[in-house]
Amino acid sequence: IFSESANVNVDIDGQLEDNYTGFGYNGPRVHTITLFANPIFQKPNSNDAFVKVLQPNEDINSLDRNSFKTIVFAPGVHDIGLSYKIHNNETYYIPGDAVVKGTMHPENKWGRDATKNFKIYGSGTFSSEHIVRHPDDDDNKSVKPFTYQAEGAHLEGFVIADPAFHTLNMSHTGDANNINIYKNLKILAWRKNSDGVNAFRNSEVSDCFFRVQDDAFYLGAENVNQHHNTVWTDANGAVLFLQNINDGSTCTFSDVKVIYQRASWHWWHGGRIVSFRSLRPGNKLVNVHVKNILVEDPLPAFPSFYGRIIKKGNSQEEVAMENVIFENIHQLHDGVSSKLDDEKGKPRNTLDGLDENRTIKNIKFINCSFMGKSINGFEAGNFFTEFVDSKTIKFITTPKKN
C-alpha cells in the first residue's frame, strides 16, 4: 500500500512471451506485476450519519448493524473474519489503499428472502491469503470470497487476491429484472479450485480480469450475460466450462481475450478455451452460442476445443445436444503440449462421444481458426474424433467484409 503518489516505470522484458512457463519449465521464477487503470470511484460522504469509516483496528463484527448503511474501509489492513454477513441495501467501499481480509456473504436464503440490493466497490483489495483450506474440504463455503444467493448485488472494481476456493459463486433466485452485476473485477489466484465466476442466473459479468488456476467462467443456467473479459491461466482450467445446459438461449458469452493459457500438466481433460469435458448420460447441451474469443498467447498450452461424454454407472440415458454454436474463436499458435512429450501423444482439439448411441453432434463452428488457418473441417482443426455424428458437425466460413 502506497500512502503517497508514485511514478511507475514499465519495462516489459518478454519473459512470458519468450518462455513457456507450464509443464516442463525448469527456469527461474518469473515474477509479475499487474497494473490496472481504474475509473475514479465516488467515495461515500463520511459526514452522513449512516456512513461509518472503519479503522483497521476496529472489529466490524461488533458494530450495531442499525447504526450504518455504508462502510468505508479506512487505509490499512482490515480483518473481517469468515462469512461476514451482508444485509439488504448495504454499501461497502474499499479504496485503493485498503486491504480487506476475509470472506463476505449474503444470507443463505432463497427467492424473496435472499439478500438484496447491496454494493461492494472501489479499487482496493479483498484478500484470502491468510485463509487455510484443505483440498478435500469442498463443502466449506465459508472460505469462498462470495457465495450463497443475492438479488440486485453490485460488485465493482476491486481486486480479489489469493481466493482459497471458488471466487464468485453467488446464485440469483429472485426478481429476474433485478440482476447481479459483476463489473471491472480482478482476480489474482494461485490455488487449486480457484475458479473465477459461476453467476448461475440473472447476472451480468463484464470488463473483468481473471488470472485463475481453474475454470474461469461457467455459462450459467438462465439470463447470464458475460462479455468483454480477459483471462490468464497458469496451471489448469478452461476459459469457459460448459456443464449440463438445459437451455442456454438466454445466456451469452462473448468478446473474451485470453492473454496467457498455460498448464502445469498436459494430459488431463480440463484446460482448454472451451470445454464440455464431463457430459454424462441424462445431460443436455442445448442452445449454446459462444462467440468472439481471441487467444493471444504465443505459447498456449493446448488447442482450443475439448468435448467429451463420460459414463455414469450403467446408465443408458441419452445425451441431448442441439444448436451448439462456436463462432469467431481464434487461436494463432499450436499448443505447446505437442512439443514436450513423445510418449503420451499430442493433445488435440477433441470431440469424444461415449458410444454409437451417445455421440457428439449438432455443433456449428462458424469462422473459427487454428494456427492462423480457417477451421473448415476436422483435418484443418487437427481434431481427434470418436463417436461423433459427423453429418451434424458443420464448419462454416464466410468471406471477410472489406
Identify the role of each PLM range.
Residues S3, D11-D13, F36, L54, ...:
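A structural detector for beta-sheet-dominated domains
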Residues V143-P145, T167, S194-G196, A216, ...:
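Structural detector of coil-to-beta-strand junctions
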Residues N89-T91, G96, K116-S128, E151-D162, ...:
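Right-handed parallel beta-helix
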Residues I1-N88, V99-H105, K109-K116, G122-D138, ...:
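Extracellular "leader-to-stem" segments immediately downstream of a signal peptide or signal-anchor
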Residues I33-L35, M104, F146, F217, ...:
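Short beta-strand element of the conserved SAM-dependent methyltransferase core
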Residues F2, N61-N66, H78-T91, V99-S123, ...:
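Extracellular beta-strand-rich solenoid/capping regions of secreted or surface-exposed proteins
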Residues S264-N402:
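Extracellular beta-rich repeat passengers
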Residues Y20, G102-M104, H130, N236, ...:
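Short acidic, gly/pro-rich beta-turn/loop elements at beta-sheet edges
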